[in-house]
Amino acid sequence: MIIKPRVRGFICVTTHPVGCEANVKEQIDYVTSHGPIANGPKKVLVIGASTGYGLAARISAAFGSGADTLGVFFERAGGETKPGTAGWYNSAAFEKFAAEKGRYARSINGDAFSDKVKQVTIDTIKQDLGKVDLVVYSLAAPRRTHPKTGETISSTLKPVGKAVTFRGLDTDKEVIREVSLEPATQEEIDGTVAVMGGEDWQMWIDALDEAGVLADGAKTTAFTYLGEQITHDIYWNGSIGEAKKDLDKKVLSIRDKLAAHGGDARVSVLKAVVTQASSAIPMMPLYLSLLFKVMKEQGTHEGCIEQVYGLLKDSLYGATPHVDEEGRLRADYKELDPQVQGKVVAMWDKVTNENLYEMTDFAGYKTEFLRLFGFEIAGVDYDADVNPDVKIPGIIDTTV
């Protein structure tokens, strides 16, 4: 079939398998052209491995450090008449390129929050890898079925303590509009912490540790975003921020557990990028469009692969890691440069419907968004007939 982008709100409901493969190849080429990660990991588990930062971590480990990788994700395969999810195609492409290099790469499809998927993962590590020396936690999900209670909990994107009104960009209509959000209830805050906080990360590490599949010296990291003042009301000081603060609490006991075997646990702070998760946050498209313009002008613009490759090379496995006073690894320092933030803030209220394209890099934002789904990739013929039914050989599918 010939597949074209069809966007509804903050999701593109079509995906392009050849485009997704080309996008993965571009990221692999970036890593291989920037040289190996010294003393990097060799057997890696990535939880949330199919898109965005998790995929970038899997690529960086495999192609920057020669690592065998096991990826966990929740994606949908394509059929003869309907495309699958971008994450499915990304993972199929990743495994294909890893196999060409003779690297072990296997994937588990299912609900990473569940005990079942944790057990299947442990069994697979024991059978195929023995032990893992890096666990990357990169889940972004709107809801979670708690494995102990069976309750399905939802996360909420709201401010805490007060209603907030802010400027946003309606990406469908391409207009600036005011967005007002009422404060989250305590129940909504608790739900967001349960879905996006550190409990599941801790459950994963506890399960892996009890099963004896963490190597001596094993490290783990979970990805987070802090942002600057302009996004704080909705993000760091909002319900999502409460979940992110929970990561900072949970990491302490995880670190103690791993330190007993010479290992370490860190929260890693990454910059704002276009992902399926960030495009759903009301003020992020406008913020990202301004941020891209400023950072591209300064020559400091980065996407997922640049961020995560740099994180592994410089901080997780580097001699002089970028660490803040909270003990977090920081890869967002270029975004938070006062000059960059100052320019973004100065332009924030000046953007109008009329000057949107000249004042911001909304065009670049739209391109990045479509690239998530395999569109707008250089060298791909989007008028060609493609087969959406792409197999992942050896996948362990717990959803069937």
Curated annotation (Swiss-Prot):
Database matches in Pfam families: Eno-Rase_FAD_bd (PF07055), Eno-Rase_NADH_b (PF12242), Enoyl_reductase (PF12241)
HAMAP family referenced in this protein's UniProt entry, alphabetically: FabV_reductase
Keywords: Fatty acid biosynthesis, Fatty acid metabolism, Lipid biosynthesis, Lipid metabolism, NAD, Oxidoreductase
Residues binding substrate, per UniProt: Y225
Record protein name field: Enoyl-[acyl-carrier-protein] reductase [NADH]
Enzyme class, broadest EC rank: oxidoreductase
Role noted for this protein: Involved in the final reduction of the elongation cycle of fatty acid synthesis (FAS II). Catalyzes the reduction of a carbon-carbon double bond in an enoyl moiety that is covalently linked to an acyl carrier protein (ACP).
Gene field: fabV
Reaction equation(s) it catalyzes: a 2,3-saturated acyl-[ACP] + NAD(+) = a (2E)-enoyl-[ACP] + NADH + H(+)
Pathway: Lipid metabolism; fatty acid biosynthesis
EC number(s) recorded for this UniProt protein: 1.3.1.9
InterPro entries: Eno_Rdtase_FAD-bd_dom, Enoyl-CoA_Rdtase_cat_dom, FabV-like_NADH_b, Trans-2-enoyl-CoA_reductase
Site (Plays an important role in discriminating NADH against NADPH): E75
Subunit structure: Monomer.
Biological process terms in GO annotation: fatty acid biosynthetic process
Protein family membership: Belongs to the TER reductase family.
PANTHER family (alphabetical): ENOYL-[ACYL-CARRIER-PROTEIN] REDUCTASE [NADH]
Annotated binding of NAD(+), by residue: 48-53, 74-75, 111-112, 139-140, 244, 273-275
Residues of the active site: Y235
GO molecular function: enoyl-[acyl-carrier-protein] reductase (NADH) activity; NAD binding; trans-2-enoyl-CoA reductase (NADH) activity
